[in-house]
Amino acid sequence: FVFTQDFGRAEEVDRYRRLMEAVCELVVQRYDGSLKAEHGTGRNMAPFVELEWGTKAYGLMKDIKQLFDPEGLLNPGVIINDDPEAHLRNLKPMPAAGQLYAPVDRCIECGFCEPQCPSHGLTLSPRQRIVSWRELSRREAAGEAPGELGKDYLYMGLDTCAGCGLCATACPVGIDTGTLVRAVRGENISGVARQLGRMAANHFGATQALARSAIKAGHLAEAIVGPRLLGRLSGGAWKAGMPHPQPAGRATAVSGDKVVYFPTCSGRMFGADTPEAALSATVIRVLERAGYAPIVPDGVDALCCGQSFASKGLADEADQKSAELEAVLRRASDNGRYPIVLDASACSLRMKTFLAERLPVFDIVEFAHDALLPRLMLQKKAEPVLLHLNCSASRMGFAAKL
């Protein structure tokens, strides 16, 4: 079991003292048991070693310690400790995170999440984000100013978190620190930004058209001033090799097994490198070659799974777009009669989570592996391929299939 003790208050420290004394009395005096199993004696159990082993045995331990380490340099205060309240010293306050994302209160700061995090080494790891948030929560509860920590946390804790959830795959208790970050982003978002997000959600087709025009204008400017100067002028937003926008592909097959294909907005916004075909056109061609008759819902340019809004902390707008997409997919799939395929793993995971199996949604990776490969005759090519297993595909367990 996991319990989170807030050591920021004296009454909670006293409560913990009474708990430890009661547990030790129950185990040692009532059942003549051992206070430790696979774990060794640490500072938390050092005051109770004499209770467990008896005064005579504990005296022998102290004599041996004195012989080998008379200055007390080796592991001081562990096992042998004359302070009966050593387990109550230097306790770290762990205030509750509140209602933003309560599961972070279960974090024991083990650090298993750190190797999974894309931003670990750049700014903070998930463990460090949680620890920093706890300190900010403690300061707020104590009426203290957040100080430099509060300013630094905006970039190091919030802006650089990918919100991918890979930390949850390694966490012993399944904590997704990205959920906390998105909630905090939502708390901190300005009124103007929230209004713009609401407008984008309500007029997504127009927003996408505007973004397409901006990308086209960027390519025009790049042709005039060059990519390096444009990159500097845009503050690094414009990158060399920025793809051109391409429209969603059109299905042509009229016979075959029906499958609903939703071209996600990222694929609609950014086309493939010239002269390769657009992602949606490629997916449709492969589906048709495998004997499927793809159904592309009408009005896809106005549709979005909501992932882009959720990443910014706009939870209501994200759910709005997910619900709109669900309604369209339900009609297109004849109430779930036909499978539904999405071509971006982040969007697939978003809709799988939102729908909770109300509709048969498949990521293109799993559908290609499970449904397309058995129908296709493949010709292998001895050419190198760069394979990137992204965060969402990894969370859905598609490594082997990819």
Question: What positions do the PLM features span?
Answer:
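Short acidic, glycine/serine/threonine-rich loops at helix termini
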Residues: V2-Q5, V13, A46-E50, V78-I79, ...
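Glycine- and acidic
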Residues: V2-R9, R43-P47, A102, P118, ...
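Ferredoxin-type iron-sulfur electron-transfer modules in oxidoreductases and energy-metabolism complexes
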Residues: D14, G59, I80-V104, E114-P115, ...
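Conserved glycine-rich FAD pyrophosphate-binding loop
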Residues: V2-R106, S125
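Iron-sulfur cluster-binding electron-transfer modules in prokaryotic oxidoreductases
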Residues: D69, T177-L402
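Generic beta-strand/beta-sheet core signal
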Residues: V2-D6, K36-E38, N75-G77, C110, ...
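Immediate flanking context of iron-sulfur cluster ligation sites
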Residues: Q29, A97-F112, G150-C164, G256, ...
